[in-house]
Design a protein with these regions (language model features):
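C-terminal outer-membrane beta-barrel translocator/porin domains of Gram-negative envelope proteins
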Residues: 1-7, 13-15, 165-289
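Gram-negative/organellar outer-membrane beta-barrel architecture
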Residues: 1-192
Length: 289
């Protein structure tokens, strides 16, 4: 449990690190109570909420021995979240109370006149629904430290009067993407490495929807004062498109040969987001500086 400016925050999670999907419906296999165990698979369930302002639900499953014969990673996850904005009445009332308190010398401590809890606005929200499917495998070339990963993901954004994305505030948007990643890790310890390096590179791409949907994005949703602006926004961002590139490198060098010593870590990270069509840039999946 926790306490934030929007009220009480609660979080409940369950993680099983020795789960067995194969034993789930087999009563003759190993169980702990009603839970099938013994395969080293991971099952996670989570819920987080602070009442009407925010709810989040997620479930995921992963295994490092998909098929049971080779070290092949497989993962699957689903999630849903909803965030609700604060009514503009809150800011009006907060300013008025601050002004009156300044003029009269009274404090509003102990009163709920300016608490977020009193200004929940159901007409301002963001809902996110998604699922992902992942696969990974060790490589033998160029050496045994390399791994290859692939992930297919889908996310649906549902917005109403949401003012935080700038380009898009009301409507539904879909994101279907594929991520290819390669990683090389040669550190001597996962938690406190003294030697080795960790390199990773990935690219995430969506289909170039604008290449074949025959829409004039140059003149679509350009005038906020137009009566059709909201509907044009929904048409423009129904399917978002982009390509995202990431690179990360870290090296670790022990400064002495002693068992306990200082370790020098060098690090570099790079990220790039591009668009297929300069008139259809994604309001989501961007970098924030």
């Amino acid at each position: 449990l926790g306490l934030g400016q929007t009220g009480i925050i609660g979080r409940v999670g369950l993680t099983l690190n020795n789960f067995s999907m194969a034993n789930l419906f087999n009563k003759n296999k190993e169980h702990r109570g009603i839970m099938p165990i013994g395969e080293g698979e991971k099952l996670s369930l989570g819920v987080q909420t602070n009442g009407q302002y925010y709810q989040s639900y997620n479930a995921s499953y992963s295994t490092n021995w998909f098929g049971g014969k080779r070290p092949i990673q497989f993962s699957f996850g689903v999630y849903y979240s909803k965030m609700t904005d604060v009514s503009s009445n809150y800011y009006n009332q907060a300013w008025q109370n601050s002004y009156m308190n300044y003029m009269t010398g009274y404090s509003s401590y102990g009163y709920n006149y300016t608490n977020y809890e009193n200004y929940y606005d159901p007409d301002k929200f963001l809902q996110v629904l998604g699922a992902n499917l992942g696969w990974g495998k060790r490589l033998r070339w160029p050496d045994d430290y390399f791994t290859l990963s692939v992930q297919l993901a889908y996310t649906r954004y549902m917005l109403k009067n949401w003012r935080y994305f700038g380009l898009f505030s009301t409507g539904n948007s879909n994101n279907l993407n594929l991520t290819l990643g390669i990683n090389r890790t040669s550190t001597d310890n996962q938690l406190f490495p003294r030697h080795g390096s960790d390199f990773s590179a990935s690219v995430t791409v969506t289909p170039p929807w604008s290449a074949w949907d025959n829409k004039d994005y140059k003149n679509l949703a350009t005038n906020p004062n137009s009566p059709s602006y909201v509907s044009e926004q929904q048409e423009k961002y129904k399917w978002i498109e982009y390509h995202k590139w990431k690179f990360k490198a870290r090296t670790f060098t022990a400064l002495t040969s002693a068992q306990k010593c200082f370790v020098l870590m060098t690090r570099i990270e790079f990220g790039l987001v591009g668009s297929y069509n300069k008139y259809k840039k994604s309001p989501f999946e961007t970098y924030y500086m």
